[in-house]
Amino acid sequence: MGIFDKIREGLRKTRDNISGQITQMVNSFTKIDEELFEELEELLVMGDVGVNTAGFICDRLRQRIKEKGITDPSLIMGELKAIVSDMLQGDNELHISTKPSIILVIGVNGVGKTTTIGKLASRLKGEGKSVILGAADTFRAAAIEQLEVWADRAGVPLIKHKEGADPAAVVFDTIAAAKARDCDVIICDTAGRLHNKKNLMDELGKISRVIDRELPGCDRETLLVLDAATGQNAVNQAREFQSAAGITGIVLTKLDGTPKGGVVLPIMQDLGLPVKFIGVGEQVDDLQPFDPDAFADALFDVQREEAPVIKEDRAAWEEERREEERLLEEQARAEAEAAAVEEEQPEPWEEEPAPVEEAPQEEPQPEKKKRRFWPFGRKRDEE
């Protein structure tokens, strides 16, 4: 599966929730009027785009339609896609050109912070960079052990202290190890304690001073990990962390399991925070760099599938649809054949070792025929 296909599949629920609903609504109108805009704004708000961002999108759409003299409602989706694509543009690149560069990863418990670090380490290593991890979240129980598992999976070294240790000391030792091993990138886990913002700011401030002293002039990223499934709560978290830490980018996880992926729009529009990566699955390679155009294309792909097409393109569209159906049928047939082969092979495979495992435990063959009271009777005789 290609990168775009991964993003497209990961956004399926969000696409159905936002552009799918909007397409159905637009197709029910024969002209563009204020009622259409009101329904559009309502659908955007329901899609976790947020009130302010929904209003901004509708205002931009009114302006574009007026400037272009558009009167056909079926053309709205194309304009909407262009607006969203423009809104998503930003500094989406990861800036790690110095050696070493450092990435601090923050986020509340349960958003996929540790998993993101492991996947990011694996991705950077796959790009030819040498990576080292620092377990500086010494506050959360089991955080160090979980990061250790991901470090092993990614095949990168991990610097750790005991639970409750000074996070800044962990960062200091990780920097020292990175220098000694000539590593390209340092990724440090940090605690995300929003319930005590003062402690969080103090901790990050101390870590920042260590980095400034030990790695002056190095490239530094502070990535906030957010769970897309939390919808507007993710925006609130971003706002809180933004006031406590110098966030340089967002990692939006679990997009594949939620229809609330529209939350990326208010994060970028209202807070001005660029999205650097998105998580579209559970596999190691499902952490994808954020591509605004690919995201917009995947989000509005429903237009190509369901919205009306103009007459000149209908033949080409029908041919494309038939080809897609043929490929899907071939794929389904191949999967069915593979499943049939798998069903045939495991049965003898599982039956052969079964007697070997049971033989030592159930030596007397008639054991299955014994009455339930027999073991009790035998036990009394032995006593």
Predicted segments with their positions:
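Solvent-exposed amphipathic alpha-helical surface segments
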Residues: 87-91, 214, 306
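Short glycine-rich anion-binding loops that position phosphate/pyrophosphate groups of nucleotides
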Residues: 191-193
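Conserved catalytic-core segment of NTP-binding enzymes
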Residues: 167-181, 195-304
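Short hydrophobic/aromatic residue motifs in ordered secondary structure
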Residues: 51-53, 140, 256, 284
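Polybasic, Ser/Thr-rich amphipathic helices
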Residues: 1-22, 26, 363-383
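Primarily NTPase-proximal linker/entry elements flanking Walker-type ATP/GTP-binding cores
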Residues: 9, 13-136, 143-163, 169-179, ...
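Short glycine/serine/threonine-rich phosphate/pyrophosphate-binding segments
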Residues: 111-118, 141-143, 233-235, 258-262
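C-terminal lobe/tail of nucleotide-utilizing enzymes
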Residues: 244, 248-360, 365-377, 381-383
